[in-house]
Design a protein with these regions (language model features):
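TM-loop-TM module centered on a large, flexible mid-protein loop between adjacent transmembrane helices
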Residues: 90-92, 97, 129-133, 203-206, ...
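Membrane-interface loop-to-helix entry segments
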Residues: 124, 138-197, 251-255, 376-389, ...
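Extracellular loop-to-transmembrane helix junctions
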Residues: 21, 44-141, 254-263, 443-452
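C-terminal membrane-solvent junction of multi-pass transporters and transport-like membrane proteins
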Residues: 166-167, 336-347, 387-438, 468
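Helix-loop-helix connectors at the membrane interface of multi-pass transporters/channels
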Residues: 2, 6-15, 90-93, 99, ...
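Hydrophobic alpha-helical segments and their helix-loop junctions in multi-pass secondary transporters
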Residues: 170-203, 267-273, 387-404, 461-465
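Membrane-interface "cap" regions at the ends of multi-pass membrane proteins
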Residues: 1-47, 51-56, 69-73, 85, ...
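A generic transmembrane alpha-helix motif of multi-pass inner-membrane proteins
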Residues: 374, 378-386, 415-486
């Protein structure tokens, strides 16, 4: 394997990049960006949010999409300057120090570890929709799903990229088909179940803002978390060919996808049917296609929703494996997570995440009625913390630029540093609005517990972190020479 196919190692901040293959092409990066920004938040969550808040949901997606885009642009600037599979953890280490890297990494791991728990259980629930699988225990299906995606991740980064490419392609094709059929139904005022499609459904069901302000704020929190995964493109940059060229294209096109797919789809849902016709128990796509009489619509949408869950699971194992390795090499995570297999895959970190995923099956067996609420609240905490740390890291980077210690790449976050502060304020307001509901207050309480555990964890590992940082960089210089000589 040539030197050009491997990630160079020069400093401790680069140590976690040693040994990876740069096998992800432009189409993989583009689809990973799509897979991260379009997922179960649209295919599953949009129905329930529409039923609660009405057409204003489209505006919520638009506003939250802008701030998610700003966060990704901040990450993109850092990634173009120095692509790293450690992504925001590596950048936090460079600009905030080891303490910042520790907090960022464990927030991100918390997010995706509990999301994996939710995803494998979701796959099992979706499979039970069909009669032929109803006799199979839920834990068996969950285990098979986890094993399948685990194997894909262990094979190679190219196998992961190919799987995510096709998962994302199915989601995009489904949305495009829906949008075409929905526009036709609205223009022709075609019957959709007991209703008639058309813009009149907005006025006849209470206008654009039928819900109260507290409800809208509660929905906004859910919408922000629906964009969780957009940061995945930063992790993939470390294993991309020509990252400096293809990463800006992937990130810039993300804002178009957000507005076109999310805002466009939700607006069409509101025109096609009164918002009261939707439900949190059913995908809005299924509601629409069933209403216009498309044969086997529910079966088709069940396959798509299943694909969305597998896509999320696939991305979760990929990202957490690499993040844990970056942390393990400097003493911030378990040593086992630092190991690579012969395919240059961080199998240690992937095994740890997959093992925690099995706890999701146990959780659903013990508290099936509230399991998803528990894990998604924890995931929300991880997303909020990760995004905030990305923006704070970018601010620290800008301070070094101002002092003349480094330079900004051509691909820059627009309006920085003011947009950093604006985005941080927005996320703080949205998270703080949790006090309006009992579930939200419980989430904030969990956030406090996580912060306490992180503080305690840092004091537990900080002595060995400093010693291992320099050792990791030095030892990996030798490893890089061996890998490049394969």
């Amino acid at each position: 394997m040539s030197d050009n196919d491997q990630t160079p190692v020069s400093t401790a901040t680069d140590a976690g990049d040693a040994g990876y293959n740069k096998a992800l092409k432009n189409r993989h990066i583009q689809m990973i960006a799509i897979g991260g920004s379009i997922g179960t938040g649209l295919f599953l969550g949009a129905g329930g949010r529409l039923a609660q808040g009405g057409p204003v949901l489209a505006l919520s997606y638009a506003v939250c999409g802008v701030f998610a885009f700003l966060m990704v642009r901040a990450l993109g600037e850092l990634a173009v300057r120095r692509p790293s599979s450690g992504a925001f953890v590596s950048y936090a280490r460079e600009f905030l120090g080891e303490k910042g890297a520790f907090v960022t990494g464990w927030f991100f791991f918390l997010d995706w570890a509990v999301t994996v728990m939710a995803d494998i259980t979701a796959v099992a629930v979706y499979m039970h929709y069909w009669n032929m699988f109803q006799g199979v225990p839920q834990w068996v299906i969950a285990l098979i799903a986890l094993a399948l995606v685990f194997v894909l991740n262990m094979l190679s980064v190219k196998a992961f990229g190919e799987a995510e490419f096709w998962f994302a392609l199915i989601k995009v094709a489904t949305i495009l088909i829906f949008m075409g059929v929905a526009i036709w139904a609205i223009l022709t005022q075609a019957p959709v179940g007991e209703y008639t499609a058309g813009v009149h459904n907005i006025a006849e069901s209470g206008g654009w803002f039928p819900a109260s302000l507290p409800v809208v704020f509660a929905l906004t929190l859910g919408v922000v978390f629906a964009f969780g995964g957009t940061e995945m493109v930063g992790v993939a940059a470390g294993e991309a060919k020509n990252a400096a060229t293809i990463l800006p294209k992937a990130i810039n096109s993300m804002v178009i996808r957000i507005f076109f797919f999310y805002v466009g789809s939700v607006t069409l849902f509101a025109f096609a049917l009164p918002y009261t016709a939707y439900s949190g128990d059913e995908s809005p796509f299924t509601t629409f296609f069933s209403g216009i009489g498309v044969p086997h619509a529910a079966d088709i949408m069940q396959v798509v929703v299943l694909t969305a869950a597998l896509s999320s699971l696939n991305a979760g194992l990929y990202a957490t494996g690499r993040t844990l390795r970056s942390m393990a090499l400097v003493g911030e995570g378990p040593r086992f997570a630092s190991r690579l297999n012969k395919n240059h895959v961080p199998y240690g970190g992937i095994i740890i995440t997959a093992s925690l995923g099995l706890l999701g099956v146990l959780l659903n067996a013990l508290v099936p009625s509230s399991a998803f609420e528990i894990v998604m609240s924890l995931a929300g905490i991880g997303i909020a913390g990760t995004w905030a740390m990305i923006l704070i890291t970018h601010l620290a980077f800008l301070r070094k630029v101002k002092r003349g210690e480094t330079q900004r790449p051509q691909f820059r976050m627009p309006g920085a540093p003011y947009t950093n502060y604006l985005a941080l304020l927005f996320f703080a307001v949205v998270v703080s609005s949790n006090v309006m509901t009992f579930e939200g207050r419980a989430t904030l309480a969990l956030f406090g517990v996580v912060v306490v555990l992180m503080v305690a964890g840092w004091y537990f590992v900080r002595r060995r972190v400093g010693n291992l940082t320099d050792e990791a960089a030095a030892s990996l210089q030798g490893d890089e020479t061996l890998v490049s000589g394969d």
